[in-house]
């Protein structure tokens, strides 16, 4: 991304039971770090003083909390930020279109504030997410255990899966899943007899999704293979459930009953 706009339809937010003005205010406050407890380190760009509309600047890593986590040297918060970054990238890559990386995202670059020392850039905070490349940092993408390696290898795996799974090619084949759990964003990509359930848990708590959610489309499913976590699940009774860990996601390929 460059600066992020909040150009959604007010009616869409109202249909979800929220006030569009207050929803925008929350997003602006959260990602600019003003909201109490927000882990994000962003900034507002192009603020309209009359309407209070604004856009959001900041690198993906900083908006997901990595900058503050590193400053506090809190390993738990660092781990959460890494999970959030891959969660955001996963939904972006698998929802359709051409997967796009904003440079620096592949190595978890946080905001670069050096632009403030340049009179030709200091007036425009979008430069914070247009970092100068640090080649020593880039080398860390090859060092197992580093944040850079976790993000780089995770991003590579996501792109490999997107390329490998033909059902994710752009066939306008997305169907959004009934929101049985409000914290889970989910859709199905279908092509012929192939069905891929893409599920993303945006909560800081584990999400429970009943197996009925995988049956209500009428597919006769026996088990599901998660390409991301490389695990197989047997589909249980309607009242039993799949557990998705906090800030985690699943890419579940359906396998029919024989």
Positions of the model-derived regions?
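Active-site and adjacent substrate-binding regions of carbohydrate-active enzymes
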Residues: 2-258
